[in-house]
């Protein structure tokens, strides 16, 4: 390494297990490593880009080790490509904001700084109440991951969930995906702090008077007896792996927290009605409480700025080098997604290098041991109490709103009218197709056995006009 190097970006195909390359592989190598280097911090969670911060003990020089995948996910770049992409991305961002700008090591930190720079003057960035913020964090899913096909393991299912497609061969595999869904979901008022905790009566009155008001509701609901489709309201799992499920078994009752958009969709679909001897009867969803957000528009300008950056990248490179365009636009979209998650960041995970298992303090609870390929413990991870978050940028209520709006849009999405170019009166999405053709929902992607017309390009009579937030066909396998 050059004696002034402060950043090392690892490129190419990188192993999924960061301990296989970021940490010494034996206790002996650990002792040798610790003679020369001090570990300032490690981030090593499976499935996430690894980072390491080190200080050379003799020269007191700091060195950060990153992976190119953190900024450019899904792109296997050479060092030359990574250097070019880093510089070009820096130029595009600086051009759009019209000032000198250095690209930060992490896309989330970069996005947060751009958000603070582009936040409208009308938004005062009121801090989120820590207790309400924590409540929102613990009651809000991000993506929806759901296999709709019978996998043959009923013992692993939640009592209130059932597959809607039997096991068996399928005629086709169709991949429908949302285009930059988070950006496309920012169409109305997102809302933000200050937030107000509501009683059951106050929550009921707010939703009745203004169902579109940015809010979260604590409700008790029962899946209608006539329902025969995927579920609409998220509930935390109680068995099997952690996460969420969407109850769809008629007659099952649950309590949960939902976003206003999710609740409105459920009621629009008739979840407040039930069969009676003389026809449908009202069976209201019961309100148990709520959290009311303030009507503000905290991120639309920031989202528009990132969309402008994507346009700049496409105009500069689309005709010259489509691969370059993909690298740059994917990085910018990734920055927005990661930044939304950064707004709801939880307690950090600390990774500590050890010589052997006896070096782990006896009072450390709930740690995960990291082992090398021979089974020796070389480090351990544990969750640490979060430092006081930046009150300007810790906004789990904003993240929860965008996640919920994106989930709703995947189920019930606006489509373009091919004759007028405006939004059609009909909708697309997972709820607007034959449920027996629905294989799975994976975030803002839908896997199905038939091509939905609304997911085709406008030129082919469909509803995809190329705008962000549209669901469109990405691939078909016979």
Model-identified regions with their sequence ranges:
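Conserved acidic
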Residues: 1-478
